[in-house]
Amino acid sequence: MYNEKRRKVTSMKIMKRRYERKLREKMKSHKHMTGLLIGLSCLIVVLGGLLLSTRHEASSQLLTPPPAGLSATTAETPLSYSPILTWQTDDEAVMYEIEFFTKKPEHISSSKISSQAVFRTRSVYQNAYNAPLEEFVEADQLGNPNEPVYWRVRALDFNGTPYTPFSELVPLYTSPNLPRMNAPVLTAEYGGPKGETLLYPVYTWIGQANAASYEVDIYAENPEVNPDAAPIETLTTTMAEIYDPEPHYSSEPFYWRVRSFDGEGQPLGDWSEVRSFRTSPDDNWQVAVLGDSISHGGGHYSYSPAVFSFSWLHYLDFPSINLSESGDTSGMTAERFERDVLPFHPAYLIIMTGSNSLRAGEDTDAVIADLESIRQRCLENGIRPILVTLPAIHPANIEHVFDEPTADDWEDRFEAVNAYIRTHTYIDMAMAIPTKDGELPTQYALDGLHPDANGKALMGAYVNSVWPEVKAEADEEMQEYLDAQ
């Protein structure tokens, strides 16, 4: 799911520390304490029921409501023999389980799979599914207005444990007169001001049944307008998403489309529609965010940066462009500065990187040197740098989800780097999410590293609460730098 650029260590031992007590002592004299209190107060309004509905994996004992908004059909409004079925997304779901029935059972449990189901799958990682009905429904039933197929869906956690009941059975009427799904359906859409413009896009779509792989082509001109247009980049994947490893920016839009291939490498239908996105320095972005996957977006294992509820930038009260790249170490972020930041020349650059380096055992002095290098180059180019402290992590959850160990002394490493950050103009993001025993709680970050939607909302609200003060400090620092030249 995330770029595998991270350096690894060879041993793991989770150390329990009383970090909370240390943070409380620091808060007494913390210069952003007022902003923190304001931020916590405003969360009641900003988050409301979001925090109340936070769940641990499968801790709801199936009291959480089942998926809703399932695709509705009637004999008069049928779908094709290869339909796309959808339901309302659930930010707490990692995957979904779907069952199909050729007859409506008289008795069926909402908490257990049914032996009467003719087809069942758990390989559903989004709130949409292209059902291969012709593989498990008799031909004389398909298209029969008096004999619909039935289906239901439930949400599962990372371990495959149900945390919601199955939905009610929904009839699925079909018609031979409707075209089958013949191409992927694109879902990612970029270009908005609320963290919705990414220098490193993630392309996502609804996949076709029986597709073994996908090809994504990116163009500098619309291939539907100019059929001879050649792609500037071609990506391949076996999943219904792919992270672009290359930055894309221009005063003109970019275009992308996807097609499927079967197991023999033959095209499985047609190209998808063409979708465009614009990432332009000409749009005069005043605020940019530079960092790793925590800022790039995504979380809860299945959600990519294309799902903006998993981006803390999406919750900001001001426009910002996302220059972050998943998988970055602090060194990688520093190396990208001239290529990825200077073309946009934002007035303010929010910088949060180093978590991947420190948890892998990188020397703290090296991370601090990378941050200082970025900070100095900002000032030299008339950009106001704003460093961001690193939130806590949860090594056991990182190991469970990513099978990656964490440096034994990660807390000391994070504390040392955060101490450096607090000597400059900074946002104390480490204070944004409440910790438990010094670690990032599972209820805010399933994978122990990337805050989920509720955690990202907390981060955005905290930034909003301190932004006027931090912005003024950044202006003052820039003026002092200019006066000293």
Predicted regions and their residues:
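Conserved aromatic anchor
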Residues: 81-92, 199-210
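Serine-esterase "nucleophile elbow" of acetyl-processing enzymes
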Residues: 266-326, 336-345
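Recognizes extended acidic, P/S/T-rich segments that occur
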Residues: 100-146, 218-249
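Oxyanion-hole/transition-state-stabilizing segment in secreted/luminal serine hydrolases
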Residues: 302-305, 313, 331-370, 392-395
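Active-site segments of SGNH/GDSL-like serine hydrolases
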Residues: 352-356, 377-411
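Extracellular fibronectin type III
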Residues: 158-177, 263-279
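Catalytic His-Asp segment of secreted/periplasmic serine-dependent ester chemistry enzymes
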Residues: 394-485
